[in-house]
């Protein structure tokens, strides 16, 4: 039996926090039901946030921005919202695929790092070339978060037992003229584990 995969467009890594959460949930629901249909209060539950008027307003505004930028299709019938991914995802050249089980492990992990930032950084690390040294700052620039957030997310990812997948992280150091060493960055490689 083939495991289900989720597809994320690389350009989603640059969108705002709420927009990424909504695109992720739309991806999950598109996989299961082809679209999300329900009230904003129910959407709060799917995203994992408190159902409050401020959060519903943020979701509503995010839905409009995503629809205006052709990330999603949005149909509103009174207070029922139907959200599905736009066809533009199918045309995207840079799709990152992950196992649905990996998403669930990241989402269900209770840690200081938010699930959406951890997922974004996971997706970035999957796409990095194995031979290129990169810093937390570089990754933070890609996804629009602070260096400390990247550090927390990488620490979280190292703790997750993916069972069939491991991140190998190596420090890249250079020797200075005075004989001391300085860290240049880290290289990330991924290994699939077969049983």
Protein language model annotation of sequence segments:
Residues 1-195:
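Electropositive, intrinsically flexible nucleic-acid-contacting patches
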């Amino acid at each position: 039996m083939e495991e289900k995969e989720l597809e994320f467009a690389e350009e989603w890594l640059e969108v705002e926090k709420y927009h990424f959460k909504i695109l992720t949930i739309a991806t999950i629901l598109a996989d299961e039901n082809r679209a999300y249909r329900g009230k904003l209060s129910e959407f709060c539950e799917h995203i994992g946030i408190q159902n409050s008027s401020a959060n519903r307003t943020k979701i509503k505004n995010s839905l409009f921005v995503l629809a205006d930028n052709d990330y999603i299709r949005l149909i509103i019938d009174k207070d029922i919202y139907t959200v599905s991914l736009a066809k533009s995802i199918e045309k995207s050249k840079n799709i990152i695929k992950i196992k649905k089980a990996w998403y669930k492990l990241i989402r269900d992990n209770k840690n200081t790092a938010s699930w959406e930032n951890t997922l974004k950084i996971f997706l970035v690390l999957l796409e990095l070339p194995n031979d290129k040294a990169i810093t937390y700052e570089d990754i933070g620039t890609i996804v629009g978060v602070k260096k400390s957030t990247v550090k927390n997310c990488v620490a979280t990812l190292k703790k997750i037992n993916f069972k069939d997948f491991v991140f190998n992280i190596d420090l890249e150091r250079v020797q200075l003229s005075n004989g001391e060493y300085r860290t240049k960055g880290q290289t990330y490689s991924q290994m699939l584990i077969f049983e």
